[in-house]
Amino acid sequence: MGPFPHNAPKSVISDENPAGTDGFEFVEFAHPEPQELRDLFAKMGFDLVARHKVKPLVELWQQGDVTYVLNADPDSFADKFVAEHGPCAPAMGWRVVDAQKAYEHAVSKGAEPYDADDKTMDVPAIKGIGGSLIYFIDQYYDTSPYNQEFEWIKESKPRGEGFYYLDHLTHNVYTGNMDKWFEFYGDLFNFREIRFFDIQGKFTGLFSRALTSPCGRIRIPINEDRGETGQIVSYLKKYKGEGIQHIAVGSEDIYASTDAIAENGLKFMPGPNPAYYEMSKDRVTDHEEPLDRMMKHGILIDGEGVLDGGETRILLQIFSKTVIGPIFFEFIQRKGDDGFGEGNFQALFESIEREQIESGEISAA
């Protein structure tokens, strides 16, 4: 199993990894009411650690090795993205061996370059999902990539509530576009498919292809609706386009981390019924996870469990409600399992479906 996103070895440029990808560096968010993002990030355990030296409304919020960029600059690409999408994720940054070489490689393979002056950082960028941006950030083994452009106001990478790496983020795309975006990541960066899912709820369904970068640190499932009225369609209407559906961050103690962010006021999607937990050992062999703590907030469990040789393969996960427009967050702990919680997809899908039916976004007819 593995390597997992949080412990994959450092990258080098190679035939297998031609762009030299090395992981997620940041996700950028923007909102018509930026204070809502500040309040949300604080609930999830993030600290405001730096401000841009010449664009003070661009902020860095960190926890462990996870960085969220809050962009409230009125002259930015992000501001234009907000005008089109409302609360949104207008960009993500990838850590790479050499930013300029990664950019040149991507453009040579057909990527659309983005060189306007309204970028968040003065680094190479291309157009990505739904017109959002992908920034390329040099690895910077011994120093921070933010030192040149940001003024630190706190120590970087605070522990927060224990979330220490960005595990994956998921895209929602228009029906028929899943293969297009698979080819985008495959042709430009040599991503490969590691999972395929076909999920059917009571009223709606979706297909999903989970992709991983050659470095193993960037994982992006791509979701496409099975019909014309499902939850992916609902997202696309609300977001006014394709984009990031959710961001997953990892903890070494999901129970303590979840207790903390719940106490901070973060709300979670409704958990499954008690039978799910009572039957969990039938599905996840010989696990010894505390059912009472799982049920407290609705933590889900997946994986093969404890194998004959004593090896553990368990994934624990829980999901927030939608908190940035239609975007939500996932909180996970990996105990030897490198999947996406396939055994819980049905429960998650139906939980989202219930939420959208109750809000009137989709019909139960």
Spans of features found by a protein language model:
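An N-terminus-focused feature that recognizes amino-terminal "leader" regions
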Residues: M1-W152, H168, T175, D179, ...
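Conserved active-site tyrosine of GNAT-family acetyltransferases
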Residues: L37-A42, A106, F184-G186, I261, ...
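A generic beta-sheet turn/junction motif
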Residues: V54, Q63, C215, T322-I324
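Flexible loop/turn segments at secondary-structure boundaries
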Residues: P56-V58, F77-A78, T143, G201-F203, ...
